[in-house]
């Protein structure tokens, strides 16, 4: 495994200032490990910031954390969310939907989907609270959301217009099983249901557009994160390997 390709994952998926001259092909080649490397790294940073903010702002720390979450991601996936929202609002043939997906202007569909995301995200972050489990909620949610975006790229053929989608699909199409195995420590019974339902919805959307793309994967990562986080908070990560390890840690100490 080349260090250059691994470090390039940070410059591609986040706003963390790590210089890399890796090509898109090299990034795509190692992207299957990004849920573990990038997902856990982001969760650790978010947890540290949240702890500091909570000491000052208490429950309102979740609102500030929303900005931190998007800032760490460089707002990259938000662009995909806005584009997908515009495409979903288009009535008509596939060509018109793809034009909206590629359009740089933001329409009512993009704004609408953004409001849906912000509403769910704010509720999830306000409910985050402060406990021993907070960091594990964030780790699980980051890993799961990144995995579902990459799993979509690996299992659904890309639209002809998406160069990024083609590159990632070619590099990931043999890695879908690996992506699922990476989930084992972090996914609960309830999140399996969320994962499957979310994937089926995105699969149907991809069919209407003619395939997957970088925008669709980015939108999936963005929109699924608060859903997984909210599920983790409500169910306390029950029936997951991560929760078992937490219980053992607390019991032994």
From Swiss-Prot:
InterPro entries: CobS. GO terms for cellular component: plasma membrane. It is a multi-pass membrane protein. Its cofactor is Mg(2+). It is found in: Cell membrane. The keyword Transmembrane applies. GO terms for molecular function: adenosylcobinamide-GDP ribazoletransferase activity; cobalamin 5'-phosphate synthase activity. Keywords: Cell membrane, Cobalamin biosynthesis, Magnesium, Membrane, Transferase, Transmembrane, Transmembrane helix. Pathway: Cofactor biosynthesis; adenosylcobalamin biosynthesis; adenosylcobalamin from cob(II)yrinate a,c-diamide: step 7/7. One of its GO terms (biological process) is cobalamin biosynthetic process. It comes from the Archaea. Its EC number is 2.7.8.26. Joins adenosylcobinamide-GDP and alpha-ribazole to generate adenosylcobalamin (Ado-cobalamin). Also synthesizes adenosylcobalamin 5'-phosphate from adenosylcobinamide-GDP and alpha-ribazole 5'-phosphate. PANTHER family: ADENOSYLCOBINAMIDE-GDP RIBAZOLETRANSFERASE. NCBIfam families: cobS. This is Adenosylcobinamide-GDP ribazoletransferase. The lineage of its organism: Archaea, Thermoproteota, Thermoprotei, Sulfolobales, Sulfolobaceae. The gene is cobS.
